[in-house]
Amino acid sequence: MVSSNTDLTYSSAIEGGIVVSKADAVINWIRTNSMWPMPMGLACCAIELMQVGNGRFDIARFGAEVMRFSPRQSDCMIVAGSVTYKMAPQIRRIYDQMMSPKWVIAMGACASSGGMYRSYAHMQGVDRILPVDVYISGCPPRPEGILDALMKLQAKIRTERAGQNLFKATV
């Protein structure tokens, strides 16, 4: 009995069913639409951060509804509130525990520039210890501002090269 190999031959009927894309575009689409933010609620901005999860603002539209409180399960840190020099090493350590790629949003005037606190104990912006991707102004910022910052971060992620940080040499 002779078997035919017709199953392995090319068929022109499947041409319309295949989607061809660059791997970067696919990976960035996944990263954009499934962000896992970790809130660092250090002061009163954390109360406004809670508001984006309710039905009126609905952060789930942007794929970021699941807040993770473990740095190993998150890829976006939202620093909400004033950063003191005493808290800075812990924030940096938590940031270092996050898997790559990772992004940071500085939420509010205190996290962005120190806010109204100009003292020996308060750091003048979290960007002195972390690379900040998006800043949100306001004291405290409105939930619409948080959603706008999330959309700006998603636009930034879409333009990144997804494969450049996959294989880093460890020193």
Swiss-Prot record:
Catalysed reactions listed for this entry: a quinone + NADH + 5 H(+)(in) = a quinol + NAD(+) + 4 H(+)(out)
Binding-site residues, [4Fe-4S] cluster: 44-45, 110, 139
UniProt cross-references to InterPro entries, sorted A to Z: NADH_UbQ_OxRdtase-like_20kDa, NADH_UQ_OxRdtase_20Kd_su
Gene Ontology CC annotations of this record: plasma membrane; respiratory chain complex I
Cofactor: [4Fe-4S] cluster
Subcellular location: Cell inner membrane
First-level EC class: translocase
Keywords on record: 4Fe-4S, Cell inner membrane, Cell membrane, Iron, Iron-sulfur, Membrane, Metal-binding, NAD, Quinone, Translocase, Transport, Ubiquinone
Biological processes, Gene Ontology terms: aerobic respiration; electron transport coupled proton transport
One Pfam match: Oxidored_q6
Main location: membrane
Entry GO MF terms: 4 iron, 4 sulfur cluster binding; iron ion binding; NADH dehydrogenase (ubiquinone) activity; NADH:ubiquinone reductase (non-electrogenic) activity; quinone binding
Membrane topology, record value: Peripheral membrane protein
Domain of life of the organism encoding this protein: Bacteria
Entry EC no(s): 7.1.1.-
Free-text remark on how the cofactor is bound: Binds 1 [4Fe-4S] cluster.
Family: Belongs to the complex I 20 kDa subunit family.
Biological role: NDH-1 shuttles electrons from NADH, via FMN and iron-sulfur (Fe-S) centers, to quinones in the respiratory chain. The immediate electron acceptor for the enzyme in this species is believed to be ubiquinone. Couples the redox reaction to proton translocation (for every two electrons transferred, four hydrogen ions are translocated across the cytoplasmic membrane), and thus conserves the redox energy in a proton gradient.
Subunit structure: NDH-1 is composed of 14 different subunits. Subunits NuoB, C, D, E, F, and G constitute the peripheral sector of the complex.
UniProt protein name: NADH-quinone oxidoreductase subunit B 1
Originating organism: Opitutus terrae (strain DSM 11246 / JCM 15787 / PB90-1)
Gene name per UniProt: nuoB1
